[in-house]
């Protein structure tokens, strides 16, 4: 018997080479979405045999520039990161892409981010059945839960402490989401003119 060594990126569960091969053969730009405990990262990548080229990048820390006071790792933030990414893509004439998840599973945060990219006007194949509900994305469920919890003042302040510290009333969460979405849609992402 002999030992057949597997590639390091397979052993570390970083790369699915069947999906990777399909991406390289298609020669289309692809979007990767990574979620962590605190942030959501979205990248537009151009595949290349010598190494992938990152064309655009967006993460949930950028939402603070638009006045986002909510959490940076929930469905609302994920949708807004996708919307921001889609606007950046369109400003650089990248109007289509496909999703590449690699070894990570398709979660609701990834689906919300993908829905945000599609809402910006980017052509991306997606199924509406796998997308989260609009009420979950805009935070209506948070506002409803806050109105129920408001009767118990101590529990209300404990559960919504970060929102209250950021001067955001939890009942106004959907309204705040709409404001930030409108700011992202109305902002311009024009490329700076190259000199020379």
Residue ranges and their predicted role:
Residues 1-196:
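Ribosome-associated RNA-binding proteins
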């Amino acid at each position: 018997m002999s030992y057949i060594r597997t590639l390091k990126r397979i052993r570390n569960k970083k790369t699915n080479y069947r999906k990777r091969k399909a991406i390289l053969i298609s020669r289309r730009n692809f979007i990767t979405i990574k979620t962590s405990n605190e942030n959501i990262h979205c990248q537009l990548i151009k595949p290349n045999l010598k190494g992938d080229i990152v064309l655009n990048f967006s993460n949930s820390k950028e939402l603070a520039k638009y006045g986002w006071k909510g959490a940076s790792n929930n469905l609302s933030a994920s949708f807004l990161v996708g919307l921001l990414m889609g606007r950046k893509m369109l400003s650089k004439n990248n109007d289509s892409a496909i999703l590449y998840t690699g070894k990570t599973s398709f979660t609701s945060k990834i689906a919300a981010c993908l829905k945000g990219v599609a809402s910006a006007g980017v052509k991306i194949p997606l199924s509406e059945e796998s997308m989260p509900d609009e009420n979950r994305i805009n935070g209506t469920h948070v506002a409803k839960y806050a109105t129920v919890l408001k009767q118990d003042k101590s529990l209300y302040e404990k559960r919504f402490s970060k929102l209250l510290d950021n001067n955001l009333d939890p009942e106004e969460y959907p309204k705040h989401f709409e404001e930030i979405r409108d700011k992202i849609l109305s902002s311009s992402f024009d490329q700076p003119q190259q000199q020379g």
